[in-house]
């Protein structure tokens, strides 16, 4: 959002995240696509001022739930890979979104095991305002690449520092609020 969002999207989405008022989940992985992010099949089809999202994502989040979801979806089914994807930030409570827990074995303390909860998230004709589209239709590969670069640290320190500097400049008006709370 910081890099690819419009100013209106930054104003709507970022302050509540900075203030810790909302919990977010990223939804990338799909059954059958695994780590092939360009192979997602969850569809987001434009219908007037909305997108209708249908599909599912797996290995999502934790048992704490989410208020907002950022996700990649296919907005041009059958289109060229990497040129048919779009990035969205949407309200997790929209009608048609169902979260189903997946109990998985994870690593616990002292090398033991603990159950680790992830979720499957289903989208059944979820209507999302076009405002939720980040970075432009069919430009999701760029947004996802930027997101993963920041998350995983690929692309080198210079790129991360530049984005971090932008983040700090953007958050500066909220520092007092952040420090008080």
State what each model feature region is.
Residues 2, 72, 181:
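A cross-family signal for key residues in well-ordered alpha-helices
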Residues 9-166:
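FAD-binding core of flavoproteins
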Residues 168-181:
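Membrane-integrated ABC transporters
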């Amino acid at each position: 959002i910081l890099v690819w969002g419009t100013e209106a999207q930054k104003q709507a989405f970022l302050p509540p995240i900075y203030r810790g008022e909302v919990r977010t989940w990223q939804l990338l992985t799909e059954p059958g696509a695994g780590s092939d992010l360009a192979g997602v099949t969850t569809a987001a089809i434009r219908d007037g001022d909305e997108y209708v999202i249908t599909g599912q994502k797996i290995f999502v989040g934790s048992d704490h739930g989410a208020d907002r979801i950022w996700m990649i979806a296919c907005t041009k089914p059958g289109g060229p890979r990497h040129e048919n994807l779009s990035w969205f930030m949407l309200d997790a409570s929209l009608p048609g979104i169902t979260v189903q827990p997946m109990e998985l074995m994870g690593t616990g303390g002292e090398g033991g095991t603990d159950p680790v909860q992830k979720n499957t998230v289903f989208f059944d004709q979820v209507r999302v305002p076009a405002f939720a589209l980040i970075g432009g239709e069919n430009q999701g590969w760029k947004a996802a690449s930027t997101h993963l670069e920041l998350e995983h640290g690929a692309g080198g320190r210079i790129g991360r520092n530049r984005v971090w500097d932008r983040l700090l400049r953007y958050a500066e008006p909220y520092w007092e609020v952040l420090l008080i709370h």
